[in-house]
């Protein structure tokens, strides 16, 4: 099949999943064309059967804001004609599904099929805004197929937008071998040390509640020698740094910044903290589990579908830093307990093997192509 993929060119979960999906599809023999506003972080090298096409932006004096959605639709039409695309798989209903549908109707002779994957904020934040609500619902209803990355997100989309069409639940995925493989010498240097290592990985948006990470760590430090690695960057990083100073743990907290490859640094972790206010899936939790790292997170969104409470980690109410600290100590305070959680984490992560999940997407592509005949 000849498949176009559009996603955000960021280090967030949707961009990671979309890029890795495209690479796996290419290895399976499909032709894949990525179309985005900028270079994709997980596509530093262009593999065989993969092409990348940037949707350029231009300034125009009559327009206060550049119409990126229209420009993207035009680029999709151009690439679809050049690469003879059959499928457009867009990750996020807004803005990408709307642009893909615009392209589909602008070039009906191409008979493009639009597959939309809902990742979370396109439903819970952007799409529910009254400004975007009608177009979000339209984009979902008009797509040839729609998937959601968790059952929770599926249910939210149906409830929030009164969706009548079927939505397939297709979970995010990992490559278990890639996470299991040791990587000596390629771990980014970190300047602090400790007996156990807690880790947080995110884009440091307020919804990630990074200050709660620091609060949990400060409580753990009262009982264990530990360090905290804060991986990523974003608007809430400064507040988390200041809180570490205020709580007297700054010398044990390292702000590592953004890393392109997550597997090497996960090999340093004994526990992942993910105290988010909402998570539609929680890809970083799955990546941690695949690396044998138990997870203490919040009982929100799709996280209970990933983290098995009491087996691969624990789930606490949002903002309950005392409960999260107690759970962290329960796992970290006994090596045998930690080993049991680590082994269970690896085992559960295998349920999200890319071979199974990519096969589900291929079946959806074949279904929408068959529907046109």
Indicate residue ranges for each PLM-predicted region.
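Conserved acidic donor-binding segment of nucleotide-sugar-dependent glycosyltransferases
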Residues: 309-310, 314-321, 330-335
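N-terminal strand-loop element at the rim of the active site
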Residues: 7-11, 18, 23-68
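Aromatic "clamp/platform" in nucleotide-sugar-dependent glycosyltransferases that forms part
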Residues: 258, 277
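An aromatic- and histidine-rich active-site surface loop
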Residues: 87-111
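Conserved donor-binding/catalytic core segment of Leloir-type glycosyltransferases
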Residues: 147, 190-217, 229
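A short, well-ordered alpha-helix in the C-terminal region of glycosyltransferases
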Residues: 323, 330, 337-351, 360-363
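Carbohydrate-associated surface elements
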Residues: 152, 173
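Short hydrophobic beta-strand element within catalytic cores of glycosyltransferases
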Residues: 294-297, 307
């Amino acid at each position: 099949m000849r498949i176009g993929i559009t996603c955000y060119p960021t280090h967030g979960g949707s961009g990671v999943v979309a890029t890795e999906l495209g690479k796996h599809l290419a290895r399976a023999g499909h032709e894949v064309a990525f179309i985005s506003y900028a270079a994709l972080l997980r596509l530093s090298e262009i593999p065989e059967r993969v092409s990348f096409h940037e949707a350029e932006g231009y300034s125009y004096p009559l327009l206060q804001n550049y119409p990126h959605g229209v420009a993207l639709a035009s680029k999709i039409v151009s690439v679809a004609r050049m690469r003879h695309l059959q499928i457009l798989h867009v990750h996020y209903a807004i803005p990408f599904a709307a642009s893909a549908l615009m392209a589909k109707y602008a070039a009906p002779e191409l008979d493009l099929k639009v597959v939309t994957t809902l990742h979370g904020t396109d439903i819970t934040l952007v799409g529910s805004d009254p400004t975007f609500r009608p177009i979000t619902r339209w984009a979902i209803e008009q797509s040839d197929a729609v998937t959601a990355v968790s059952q929770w997100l599926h249910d939210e989309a149906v409830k929030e937008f009164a969706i009548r069409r079927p939505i397939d639940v297709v979970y995010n995925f990992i490559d278990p071998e890639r996470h299991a493989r040791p990587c000596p010498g390629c771990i980014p240097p970190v300047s602090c040390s400790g007996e156990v290592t807690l880790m947080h990985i995110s884009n440091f948006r307020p919804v990630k509640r990074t200050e709660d990470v620091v609060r949990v760590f400060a409580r753990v430090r009262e009982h264990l020698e530990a360090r905290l690695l804060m991986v990523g960057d974003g608007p809430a990083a400064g507040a988390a740094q200041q809180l570490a100073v205020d709580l007297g743990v700054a010398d044990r907290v390292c702000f590592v910044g953004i890393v392109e490859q997550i597997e090497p640094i996960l090999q340093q972790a004994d526990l992942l903290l993910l105290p988010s206010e909402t998570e539609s899936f929680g890809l970083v939790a799955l990546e941690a589990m695949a690396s044998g790292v138990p997870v203490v997170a919040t009982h929100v969104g799709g996280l209970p579908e990933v983290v098995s409470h009491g087996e691969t980690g624990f789930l606490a109410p949002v903002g309950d830093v005392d409960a999260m600290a107690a759970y962290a100590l329960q796992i970290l305070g006994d090596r045998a307990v930690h080993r049991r959680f680590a082994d269970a984490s690896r085992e559960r992560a295998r349920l999200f093997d890319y071979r199974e999940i990519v096969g589900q997407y291929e079946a959806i592509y074949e279904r929408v192509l068959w529907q046109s005949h």
